[in-house]
Every structure is written in C-alpha cells, then in structure tokens.
Curated annotation (Swiss-Prot):
Gene Ontology MF terms in the entry: indole-3-glycerol-phosphate synthase activity; phosphoribosylanthranilate isomerase activity
PANTHER family on file: INDOLE-3-GLYCEROL-PHOSPHATE SYNTHASE, TRYPTOPHAN BIOSYNTHESIS PROTEIN
A family per Pfam: IGPS
Protein name: Indole-3-glycerol phosphate synthase
Catalytic activity, as annotated: 1-(2-carboxyphenylamino)-1-deoxy-D-ribulose 5-phosphate + H(+) = (1S,2R)-1-C-(indol-3-yl)glycerol 3-phosphate + CO2 + H2O
BP GO annotations: L-tryptophan biosynthetic process
Amino acid sequence: MSDILKKIEAYKREEIAAAKNAVPLDEIKARAADQPPARGFYKALRAKQAAGNFGLIAEIKKASPSKGLIRPDFDPPALASAYEAGGAACLSVLTDAPSFQGAPDFLVAARAACTLPALRKDFMFEAYQVHEARAWGADCILLIMASLSDSEATDLEGEALALGMDVLIEVHDEEEMLRALKLASPLVGINNRNLRTFEVDLAVSERLAAMVPADRLLVGESGIFTHEDCLRLQKSGIETFLVGESLMRKDDVTGATKALLTGASDRIAAE
C-alpha cells in the first residue's frame, strides 16, 4: 500500500469509529434496509452499451488532493441534473471530506435530483461503510484493490451484493487486476493514475484491458478529457468511463458531457 493510502486508511479508521459511536451498526443496517431498492448501476451501464453508446459515470467532485479546489460554485443537485441531461448513465459522488471536500449530503442531494444510479466514491475498509452507503441511497460502492487484502475485498463485496448494490473494483496494475478477476463483480475500473506519483497515462488502461475476459465491463478512470480519449480506449474494449475533473471545470456541464460522449460541439444549439 502506498504512503498516501496508508494515511487515508488511518483517518478513515478514525472516522468509522466515530460514526459507529454516533450511529451503531444495528441502526445503520436498519436505515439501509429501509431504503427503496437500488437503481441498478451495472444495468444502467450495460443499457448504454447495448444501445451503442458510451457509458459515462459522471463524477461530482469539489476538490482533490492533487488539484485542490476544482469547482468553487459547487451545487450537487444542479450538477446531477446537468449530467443526466448530457447523457450520463450513472453518477459518482465523493463522500470523503479530508481529501476531497466530499460529504454524505452531496450524495443524498445529487441522487434525489435525478433518476441516475449513484456510486459512493470513498475509501472503503469496513462493512459498516457499506451499510452506511446504502442508508444514504448509494446504488454502488467502490473497492480499491491497492488498499484491501483479498479477504477484505471479498467480504466487502459480499456485504454490498447482499444489499442489492453493485460493486466497482478498482485496479491500477497487473497484480491488482489478477486479484480483481477472482471477485464476483463484473465491474472493473482501471485507474490510469499512479497512486504514488499522481501521474496519469491512458496506456495503463490499454495494457490491463488485454487481461480481462469479455464478460466483464471495463471502466476507464482518470485522464479522460476528450471524445478522442474515449475513442482511443474503445480500441482496447473500454466503452465506459468515469470522468470528473474535466467536466467539473466546465461552465456548461451538460454541453461538456454531450461533447465528451458524442464529439458534438460544447455549444448546444437552440432548440
């Protein structure tokens, strides 16, 4: 595990302990059980693919450790609506506060403003967080293989699947890909960002995609800024993308989303 992930795990463990004191596990499980059924994150991505379209997991992200503040005028419900209007299949909402200025309320508000399934984008270490995610309405969780052992990943995946959620397994090298392919989830995200240096290279996705059987749905993550980037990764069998920063920086988020997916101009013609 990188030094960055070790620091994140340390503060996450403290957060989880505090959360358990505030809302015991039994209570958070009850809240999760009271939620309506999940919207079907994986299903929404497959539907885009079946229709011959790129699948976009559009990210609602206020800030990041490497870039600082990304969007000062941060309005999660408005962003969710803009993404949906632009053709996104799903949302990804940061709930981590220390590194990304995220919050659970952002997830709740964004999901309520649209019909898209939503991923809780956070660093998951314990089952408590999985039930917490469902209690907040999340339809999918993220498991980062670089921060989890095989047994931890298996256990967390099992908790999520039992709650009717989907699981996005994130990898960034060959060893993590081999581990991810032993899990049940068909959703595998390839992070093009080196977690040690923060450098981004789309060749990571191109290299690792060759390892993946056709029954898995690959998601390209990080470093995807243009329609041309999408077309490049499509050649490696990747037709689903998780994109945040490049869209978050645009004034016209709906237009930028359409442009990313279709290559159309950012300018939306008057209708």
